């Protein structure tokens, strides 16, 4: 949850979750 994935998750889930990103504070982060 440190590196921003350049995607927001306000309205839709993180598409970048397929590469290990997760939603945190309306922004997708990679752990």
From Swiss-Prot:
Post-translational modification: This is a cyclic peptide.
Keyword field: Disulfide bond, Plant defense
A Gene Ontology biological process term: defense response
InterPro entries referenced in this protein's UniProt entry, alphabetically: Cyclotide (IPR005535), Cyclotide_bracelet_CS (IPR012323), Cyclotide_sf (IPR036146)
Cross-link (Cyclopeptide (Gly-Asn)): 1-31
Disulfide bonds listed in the record: 5-21, 9-23, 14-28
A Pfam family: Cyclotide
Role according to the record: Probably participates in a plant defense mechanism.
UniProt domain comment: The presence of a 'disulfide through disulfide knot' structurally defines this protein as a knottin.
Similarity annotation: Belongs to the cyclotide family. Bracelet subfamily.
Official protein name in the record: Cyclotide vpub-C
Lineage: Eukaryota, Viridiplantae, Streptophyta, Embryophyta, Tracheophyta
